[in-house]
Amino acid sequence: MSQHTFVAGTAPGAVPVVGHAWQMMRRPLHFMSSLSAHGDLVKIRIGPTSAYVPCHPELLRQVLTNDRVFDKGGVFYDRARDIAGNGLVTCPYRDHRRQRRLMQSAFQRTQLERYSTAMRAEIDATAARWHDGTVIDAFPELYGMALRTVARTLYSTPVTEELAQRVEQAFDTVLNGLFRQMFLPHSLRRLPTPANLRYRNNLRFLHDTVQDLITEYRRDDTQRDDLLSALLASRDEDGGRLGDTEIHDQVITVMAAGTETVAGTLTWIFHLLSRHPEIEARLYEEIDTVLDGKPPHWDDLPSLSLTDRIITEALRMYPPAWIFTRLTASDVDLAGVRLPEGTTIVFSPSSVQRHSEAYDDASRFDPDRWLPDRTSAVARQAFTAFGTGARKCIGDLFARTEATLALATMLSQWRVTVEPDADVRPVALATVYHPRRLRLRLTARTPGQ
């Protein structure tokens, strides 16, 4: 792929003043996926600012693996910092190495095994509330389950149901509002409109709540096997540690990333399985064979190989984030185009992960393309659902573990059928996108049914 002769182009349809921002707000996924028809590196306009979109997997690899030059910045990260501050996902290059070293121990496999116990407890509690014949609205239900699961993993001390519901509502309001905030001019974001006030008030509540939890943990030196305790205890090789503000930002980051990623991926998986009953039947068979009617545990995960490939393929076709941005920290050449310092790069893993040069029949749902004897280096390189290079998501295994436990738990107890009123046109949120409407009917089952 590195021998490819790249073509640079310009996207048509820019409107005076707003550029292509109106298209990104109306049909963001369609707009981003349409750009490859105009070149491998495509120039767009967001308001008065020009930006460049790498549409070819090799160009995106160059951007993601050179984080010194292609630094975190641009419209997405400017607004994401409202929520996550200077956390690991949003921090610039100068802060990233130190933060990554300090957080690494909290995401080691030994820690993940401990977290999996908390994950299972919340997933089991959610499944226990369902009844034979229950119909659930997939994304909201799975979003709530994922948020409660991440919260229990972070913070093992019980909280009131009222606080848990308030946090869930606040996150939903903020993450939905962030999409709108990304494309509003600064002057409009400052206006005291009902939407802006809801966004600010809920954002303030989230920050205050997280700070209260950190303060409580600082006062109480009880040993806990949760993620917040691991962050508080982490040290680098020089004995340095994360400060309270840094821990605050990391907690918000983990909650936001871990919730939307898992909920969106699981929702798309149920849609895909409904369209491919032969793969669905194989999945039920694997879960029944491996678990034999028992709840899934950490030690079962390596044996759930088809489950893992289904998650990977869903992440390829519907990656958890539809848009990211970077900002060039110095002048650089990309696809033969000279980009001056301060140039905005915009990219969508969704469009790149369906590129024909990386995947045969890229629009087809084929989990077995990830079998060791079928996958290629090019395909692995083009898979950027969790990023790549030094800034690859530190929580990729965390999210995969949560998704695998949730999927195996649900399908070991329930036969899941998509209701006929499904509308799978994608709805974009701040980072993820999900079907407009996907309701699931749950029918109780036992292994072999």
Curated annotation (Swiss-Prot):
Optimum pH is 8.0. It comes from the Bacteria. Its EC number is 1.14.15.32. The keyword Zinc-finger does not apply. Pathway: Antibiotic biosynthesis; neopentalenolactone biosynthesis. NCBIfam families: PentlenOxigase. Belongs to the cytochrome P450 family. This is Pentalenene oxygenase. The gene is ptlI.
